[in-house]
Amino acid sequence: MAKLEITLKRSLIGRPQPQRKTVQALGLGKTNSVVVKEDNPAIRGMITKVSHLVDVKEV
């Protein structure tokens, strides 16, 4: 299965609590932090919810 490299590109300041929790669940903390996750429907759903905050690349 493919892997996704997810980078937090925008700050969480002023964002609603559900978006903050979603970013935290993805394992992202500070701006420009990067995580590599397996590509599955659950991760894709979380990325969709915060797509305006993150950058995603297939690895």
Swiss-Prot record:
Record has Ribosomal protein as a keyword: yes
Keyword presence, Phosphoprotein: no
CC terms in the record's Gene Ontology section: cytosolic large ribosomal subunit
Listed name of the protein: Large ribosomal subunit protein uL30
PROSITE patterns for this protein: RIBOSOMAL_L30 (PS00634)
Keywords from the named record: Ribonucleoprotein, Ribosomal protein
Family per similarity comment: Belongs to the universal ribosomal protein uL30 family.
Self-association and partners: Part of the 50S ribosomal subunit.
Listed GO MF terms: structural constituent of ribosome
Family matches, as Pfam families: Ribosomal_L30 (PF00327)
Superkingdom of the source species: Bacteria
BP GO annotations: translation
Coiled coil residues, start to end: none
